[in-house]
Design a protein with these regions (language model features):
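Extracytoplasmic
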Residues: 31-33, 76-78, 142-146
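Short extracytoplasmic
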Residues: 38-68
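Long, non-globular segments of proteins
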Residues: 3-4, 21, 31, 41-42, ...
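Extracytoplasmic/periplasmic terminal helices and flexible tails
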Residues: 81-86, 92-96, 106-173
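Hydrophobic membrane-insertion alpha-helices, especially the h-region
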Residues: 4-23
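Short, compositionally biased
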Residues: 65-88
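Aromatic-capped interface at the extracytoplasmic side
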Residues: 17-38
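Cell-surface/extracellular proteins and modules involved
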Residues: 28, 51, 60, 168-173
Length: 173
């Protein structure tokens, strides 16, 4: 009985890991590529290694200046931000509680409400990089940093790459 239970638990966790990877791969393969303006915030975590915390232009929104289906939002609310491509970047065009039936949108969570403003996280706020590269990206903060994301039809976003001055950062060298 112990062997069967151990095997069952192992299979259960294997399915979870495969499901997580498949979910991200689905978004990368089927998602629409969108460029987002960003700037790095913090490049290092002693326990997790080098990564870049990214702060997007679409992360702080004034819901009085954008169409919305709600008069008030609260922390932890799920929101859907509609986007249009303008001058090659994804820019917000509305904030909604329910996913739009069509068009490009990104799913997020309200992290803070500040007057008429919302701070929204999309699950793409950190990007792990090879050791020693986080500080290099941080030093580039005065330059134009962009993030190429894939957004699937459900609004899920996955980072595909980082770009500085329009050139993709290659971490291989």
């Amino acid at each position: 009985m112990n062997k069967k239970m151990f095997l069952g638990i192992g299979i259960f966790w294997l399915i979870i890991v495969i499901g997580f990877v498949a979910f991200k791969e689905f978004t990368l393969i089927t998602g629409k590529e969108v460029l987002l303006k960003t700037m790095p915030v913090d490049p290092r975590d002693l326990f997790r290694g080098d990564y870049v915390v990214l702060n997007y232009d679409i992360s702080a929104l004034d819901f009085n200046s954008l169409p919305t289906d709600s008069a008030n939002f609260n922390d932890s609310d799920r929101v859907y931000v509609t986007l249009k491509i303008e001058d090659k970047y994804g820019v917000p065009t509305g904030i909604y509680r329910d996913p739009p039936k069509e068009g490009l949108f990104i799913k997020g969570t309200v992290k803070d409400v500040q007057g008429n403003g919302l701070i929204i996280e999309y699950g793409i706020e950190s990007y792990f990089v090879p050791e020693g590269k986080g500080w290099e990206i941080q030093r580039q903060s005065g330059r134009n940093l962009e993030v190429k994301v894939a957004i699937d039809k459900f609004g899920n976003a996955v980072i595909k790459s980082l770009l500085i001055e329009g050139k993709e950062i290659n971490f291989e060298s």
